[in-house]
Every structure is written in C-alpha cells, then in structure tokens.
C-alpha cells in the first residue's frame, strides 16, 4: 500500500535550510510535478485510516490545500483553508506559528464553536504549525476529531502529541539519512 507515495519520497531531492534537511516532494512542496496517482493514494489513505465523522476538513495553506481538496472530492465533506493572509472577516482568529525553518501568522476563518473537524497536512516535522493551529482551534471550541499528516518526519508527531494531547496519524514515516529519504514505516504495516 502507498507504493507510489513511498517511491516518490525515496526519489525526493534533499536541500539544506540551515541545519534542517528539507526534502522536496510533490505532496509536501507541489514541485517538481504532482502525480495524481500519488495524490489519490494520499487521499484514499486518509479516507481509509482517518476518522471522517466530521463537518469539515481543515488544512493549512499552502501544502495542505491539494490534500484537503482531493479528500473533499472523494468524501463530499467541505473544507476550510487556514490562510497566511488576513482577511478581516468577522470571527477571524490569528495564530502565530513557528516551524523548524520559518515563522509567521496564520488566519482561521470559516470555523465556529462546535464544528467537528479533521486537520490534514502534508508533513509533520517540527510540529510548530500543527501545535499552533490545534491550540487555537481548541480555544475556539472546535471539536478536533482527528489529525492526519501524509508524511511524518523526525520527532514532530511526538512533539505535537505531547504539547496538545491529540494523536497525529500519518501514512508514511521518513527520515533523512546521508542525504537521502528513507522510509521507516507506514500505516499499512501497522
């Protein structure tokens, strides 16, 4: 299961951002080319292993958008994008996020107290974005039913779980060793 996803990850180039090993992959970066079969595998994986007893799918701009779109199409569940741009809409909530390689503001719109959601993202690595977004949604009274990243890298999953109490599911666990992506496990092996 997830063979195309795994192969595409193994073949992904690595770039350094300071001390951070960053792999460049279509699901996590939108470049060089997004293979619809890989995207479909990812969406089908969330559909199979995620809890979709929700009102809305939530993703974070930018690399969660195509995942949420594909999942929305195959499930019929609408999605909300947490944006990097402020709109000033009524009820908008600003969130400060810090990752291993950037920081900035995110803005939540389209969610209200009592909404049941699944948060989907491309990768959990340092955990900074997920922690900030989960804490903000919890403060808003959003019912977080599930949290899902396509790719798990490093200790980010455990950092998020420790900081928020929410389990983070993933399809594939990877690490960068000697300048290459290595698959350390996948949900289909559990």
Curated annotation (Swiss-Prot):
CDD domains: PRTases_typeI (cd06223). Keywords: Cytoplasm, Glycosyltransferase, Purine salvage, Transferase. Its main location: cytoplasm. Its EC number is 2.4.2.8. One of its GO terms (cellular component) is cytoplasm. It holds the Pfam family Pribosyltran. Signal peptide: none annotated. It is an enzyme of class 2 (transferase). One of its GO terms (biological process) is purine ribonucleoside salvage. It catalyses: IMP + diphosphate = hypoxanthine + 5-phospho-alpha-D-ribose 1-diphosphate; GMP + diphosphate = guanine + 5-phospho-alpha-D-ribose 1-diphosphate. SUPFAM superfamilies: PRTase-like (SSF53271). Gene3D superfamilies: 3.40.50.2020. GO terms for molecular function: guanine phosphoribosyltransferase activity; hypoxanthine phosphoribosyltransferase activity. Belongs to the purine/pyrimidine phosphoribosyltransferase family. Archaeal HPRT subfamily. Homodimer. Catalyzes a salvage reaction resulting in the formation of IMP that is energically less costly than de novo synthesis. This is Hypoxanthine/guanine phosphoribosyltransferase. It comes from Methanobacterium lacus (strain AL-21).
